[in-house]
Amino acid sequence: MDEITAIREGIEAAFERAYNEYHVKTFRFFLKRVRMHETAKELTQQTFIKLWRSRHTLSESFSLDTQIFTIAGTILIDHLRKQAS
């Protein structure tokens, strides 16, 4: 079973492996854009919470990396919109 299928099926160990593999890269993605350490940490956390909560929508057609950064991009846009209003 691959990681995407395992996460989609709710196997926490697979989610933990994905978190361990991608959380630093995700944090750096946010830090580069928001330039605030705590905000980048919060947005990273939101990304992985959303990944877990929407795990049933994960697709085998796209890499896990692509799907995580799609979520991260959406969260960043939402954050920036809130900041602008």
Label every model-predicted segment.
Residues 33-34, 61:
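Helix-loop interface residues and adjacent transmembrane-helix termini in multi-pass membrane transporters
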